[in-house]
A protein has these predicted regions:
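Active-site pre-lysine segment of PLP-dependent enzymes
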Residues: 1-17, 24-55
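Conserved core segment of the aminotransferase class I/II
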Residues: 42-110
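Conserved glycine-rich beta-strand-loop-beta hairpin in the small C-terminal domain of fold type I
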Residues: 110-120, 131-145, 155
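Short, conserved charged micro-motifs
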Residues: 150-155, 192-196
Length: 216
């Protein structure tokens, strides 16, 4: 929260515009919801973007933007809308206005919380020493850091042969670092797939561990 305050304040002071992508804002399943930078800015220095793709269906391709009226007015004049399905858009509007979307989100939080806990338990049970991971309070993902000497980029081909997949760490770094890291998703997998997948991942990591050199 302190970093959000600092960034919003900096944007206000310097006349900057922050684009805040908060796709998982409604999927926090532990602790209180954090304030957005949009809500913290005193001078309208933040545009807040959200989406229905994480809470209803990715295929809807529907989202929203909140910001200062003058900025939204400019964005509205430049918009194009040639591919939107008006029928599904109307259904999404009905889903939200009737309160069913809020009920649905509440159910999703319970589902994703249970899946997250199961994946965390499987990581604790299966992964070799030296592996660490985050314990998320919302969203879809767990960030894993592999033991020293294991490269997530080099390992991915073997992992896929073992029927498990992930996104290597360098995909999230502008400088290409993070090769010991990877991102796992628990959103679209069953309980059985979580246990089987983490078991396969652990076996893959163990096979990639550096071989210890014998000493006299």
């Amino acid at each position: 929260v302190e970093r959000r305050h600092a960034l919003a304040k900096l944007a206000d002071e310097r006349g900057l515009l922050i684009l805040e992508d908060d796709a998982y804002i409604d999927l926090r399943f532990e602790g209180e919801k954090k304030p957005t930078m949009f809500s913290l800015s005193q001078k309208g220095s933040v545009l807040l973007f959200g989406t229905l793709s994480k809470t209803i269906a990715a295929g809807l391709r529907l989202g929203w933007c909140a910001g200062p009226e003058d900025v939204i007015a400019v964005l509205s004049r430049g918009r194009t809308d040639s591919l939107r399905n008006t029928y599904t858009s109307a259904l999404a509007e009905w889903f939200i206005q009737t309160g069913k979307h809020a009920e649905h989100i509440s159910q999703l939080r319970g589902i994703y919380s249970a899946k997250c806990e199961q994946m965390l338990a499987a990581l604790e049970r299966e992964m070799p020493a030296g592996t660490t991971w985050t314990k998320p309070k919302g969203g879809f993902f767990i960030w894993v850091t592999l033991p020293e000497g294991v490269d997530a980029v080099e390992m991915i081909a073997t992992a896929r042969e073992n029927l498990v997949d992930y996104i290597p760490g360098p995909s999230f770094y502008s400088d290409g670092s993070g090769r010991r890291s990877l991102r796992l998703s628990f959103s679209n997998v069953s309980a059985e797939e979580i246990d089987a997948g983490i078991s396969r991942l652990a076996a893959t990591v163990k096979s990639a561990l550096p071989v210890a050199t014998p000493t006299d």
